[in-house]
Amino acid sequence: NVDVLIADANETARDRAMEVADVAGIHPDQALAELSRFSCVVTSPGWRPDTPLLRAAQAAGLEVLGDVELCYRLDRASVFGPPRTWMVVTGTNGKTTTTSMLASIMQHAGYQAEAVGNIGVSVAEAVSAPQRIDVLVAELSSFQLHWSSQLVPDVGVLLNLAEDHIDWHGSMAAYAAAKAKVLAAPLAIAGLDDALVQQY
C-alpha cells in the first residue's frame, strides 16, 4: 500500500514506464522540489550518487536504495513466497562467465536456478516470476551493490578488483568497498590471487 511516482528526465522513457507500471510520473527537478512528499527513493543503478535528487534525498534523511536491494527486502519478507537462495557474483572481470557457469551447475544439480541481474532476467522479474525460481544466481555491478545496505547473500563471490567506474564512485576505495559487500555472506568466496581482494 504505497504511492509510487516515476521520476525520469527522458519524457519518452517516463511515459513508457508510466504506461507499463500504471503509475504517475514526474520530472526529477519536480521531485527535487517536492521531496517532502516522499518517504524513500528507489534509484536506478544508472544514477550516480552525486545526482542532485539523490544527494538532496539523503540530506533530507530519506532512504535511498536500489532496485536489487528492494527486491531482496521483499523476498526476505516472504512477499513472493518463502525466501529464495541468493548467490551473488561480482568483480571487475569474469562476472558473466562465472554467473552463467554457477547457474548451470545449480540447474544440473536439480535446483530451480536462474542467472539474473545484469544477465538473464532482472532480479525484480525473477522474484515475482509465476514459475518460482528458488536460487537466484545474480551478477551484480558495483552500482547495484552501492545502493544495497541490507543485502547479505547466502553466497557471495568477489572474483577480482581493478580500477573501474571511478567517475561514478568517486574513488577506487569506494568502488572496491561496494564490490566487497558480497563478502558479508555466510559463505564468501574471494579471488585471493588478487592483491586488492586480499585487503577485504
Stretches found by the model and what they are:
Residues V2-A17:
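NAD(P)-binding Rossmann-fold cofactor-contacting core
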Residues A9, H27, P45:
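Residue immediately C-terminal to the conserved phosphorylatable aspartate in receiver
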Residues M18, L32-S36, P45-L192, L196-Y200:
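Phosphate-binding loop of NTP-binding sites
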Residues D22-D29:
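Conserved SAM-binding strand-loop segment of SAM-dependent methyltransferases
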